[in-house]
Amino acid sequence: MGYGNRRPLRTWVAFTAFFAMVVSAMSPQAEAAPPAGSAAASSYFMYVATYTDGKSKSKGIYSYRFDAKTGKLTPIGLAAEIVNPGWLSTDPTHRFLYAVTERPNERGPGAYTKDGSVSSYAIDPKTGALTFLNKVNSHGGGPCYILVDPTGKTLFLANYGTGSVVSFAIKPDGSIGERISFDQHSGSSVDHARQEGPHAHAAVLSPDHRFLFVPDLGTDQVKIYKVDAVKGTFSPNDPAYVTMKPGLGPRHFTFGKDGRFAYVLCEMGSSVVVFSYDAAKGSLTTIQTAYNLPADFKGIDNSAEIEVDRSGRFLYASNRGHDSITVYAIDPAKGTLTLVQNIPTQGSIPRNFALDPTGKYVVVGNQISNELLVFDVNQKYGTLKPTGEKVDLDEPICIVFVPAA
């Protein structure tokens, strides 16, 4: 969950950036991609969660105006005072925002053992102001990830510290209701310092919403659950999990645009594992492991975030320690990754980043150097370039966009 001290595997993907750009530009999918922003708004509210303990001067969730035509960030201010909001998520209508709370001063080895919480807020579409609705117990330690299902009626939550996954009902007014389902992970893996027990790190629904995938950093597995979309319940699938290479430490999970392939970001291995996905069975089959860092990198790194762009042609992964974002081209037929670029984030520990809804910009949160930076996205090649837009903010750790009225 936090920035660890494990040396990564350092095998480099054996393709040059130039070759990847040429292949990407020649692909039929690249030619058919719609122009970024063609069906999106131009003005957004951007909410940023921050750590609030230790030396941080931040106090919770901050809001900004984001101009998708220029990439300019305009600070609005503190939107919600809340302790250590480790992750943010919105409902499908963008009327409500949800935030987990880690307990204060519990970062580091052996932390996250006491229950945290999850809070709900109503979003003012004109001003971006947040109105607190309610807060409930997370039923586990160190909550680190939340997801609202497409109906807006169920919230899924992963507890990193105690290694569990939970679902909650969402009431019509956006507030969080009763706990619906719960599953406690068990097991460990090869790194006794960081994998002494289960550490659920995300909860992601399949494109058809029938399955829930939960990468567990502590057990080197991705747990797979069947979901009852009407009731909001989940139960172990058959197969109930896929096992990763020992020590990779799976952190985050995403699907490709067409849903045929899945990508798991491995924190401890600084890598992305590519899977083919059987939508009928909910099963995953490994087809590639791509390592994010140059072969000559000798330092410590822990990869943090992963996202596929809206065209489905590129995948982005952030690396804490190497302090970079790795850009891959996605083969539309095979789902495999080819290196395009590895670009410095111009700061320390890029814990989180987000592609804006138009796909024209990436906003990066450098946690330790305390800043938000905007990068331009080359629509043809997927490459990133800093725009020069920078905003200071202590310990930014999660970024979400909401259309402004």
Question: Could you tell me what each predicted segment is?
Answer:
Residues 13-25:
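Bacterial N-terminal signal peptides
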Residues 37-66:
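An edge-strand/N-cap motif at the start of beta-rich repeat modules
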Residues 51-53, 102-104, 160, 170, ...:
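Short loop/turn segments immediately following the C-termini of beta-strands
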Residues 55-58, 82-92, 139-151, 186-209, ...:
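Beta-rich, blade/repeat-based domains predominating
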Residues 65-71, 121-128, 168-176, 226-234, ...:
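Short loop/turn segments immediately following beta-strands, especially the blade-tip
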Residues 74-80, 131-136, 189-193, 238-243, ...:
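A short beta-strand motif characteristic of beta-propeller blades
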Residues 129-202:
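Asp-box/WD-like beta-propeller blade repeats and closely related beta-sheet repeat scaffolds
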